[in-house]
Amino acid sequence: MAVEEAMTVLEPRPLSYFVETDEIKRLAERALAYIKAGFPVHFRGVSGTGKTTLAMHVASNVGRPVVMIHGDEEFSSSDLIGGESGYRIKKVVDNFIHSVLKTEEYMQRQWVDNRLTVACKYGFTLIYDEFTRSRPEANNTLLSVLQERMLDLPASRQGGESYLRVDPNFSAIFTSNPEEYAGVYRSQDALRDRMITLDLDHFDRETEIAILEKKSGLSPKNSTWIIDIVRGLRESGKCEYAPTIRGPIMIGKTLKIRGAKVSKKDPIFRETVLEILTSETSRIGSRGHQVKVKEILNGLIDKYC
């Protein structure tokens, strides 16, 4: 049986949009130290706290090619390791003697190595984004990879090898949302025990201002006003879901497109803030929630702008 590789490899490089404040720098340095010590790192936090971006940043500092996997409920172990994918057919036609036609045909099953196998084989950095969206049984194959540095291989794979020794340069970075999120499975204790978990929360004020300024192109003063509005709403405790840095970025980019000013006197600014932050902080669209949040936001806009 022939063996092919599903090569989807990213070349790590510094992210042009990445904002590195002192808080983020310290966190990235700790994560990189754990990886260099031989341990996988797990960034856990609510949506919008920069887990995937931070994972990509740390991977770029590791300096090895990156293989990325996005967790999926439909995954099985073959989606990580590999499996049979069609056949390879070879046909030889021999007509050397004009009056004689000789044909030989070979059919061979083809095995394709998937991303985990490729990363283990060549010592790439694996980023497994939202790994708890995959079923726990699909992730069982990671246990031996992270602990014994061995990847168990199916008997149907060519070569007769029952396992693959993981390259010493292999490293792994995981991200996940809290377990109470919809579509998230509880990860196995045995898997969590094999990784170092770093819990991420909302960034500090300085970092949020820097991120908004970088990603939206707004001035430092305007970025500060918008972040203060968002942080005020977050600290009010009146939201179903606390607003993240994604809301201010949406606001900033929309204001740029519409040519609006960050001012309480600009109706476009007020309308944009109310719509985006009301949407971000609610999942069920409750009328009562919308009225309450808009009342808080109007007060914050008048206070800061």
What are these regions, as identified by a protein language model?
Residues 1-305:
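C-terminal regulatory/interaction module of P-loop NTP-utilizing enzymes
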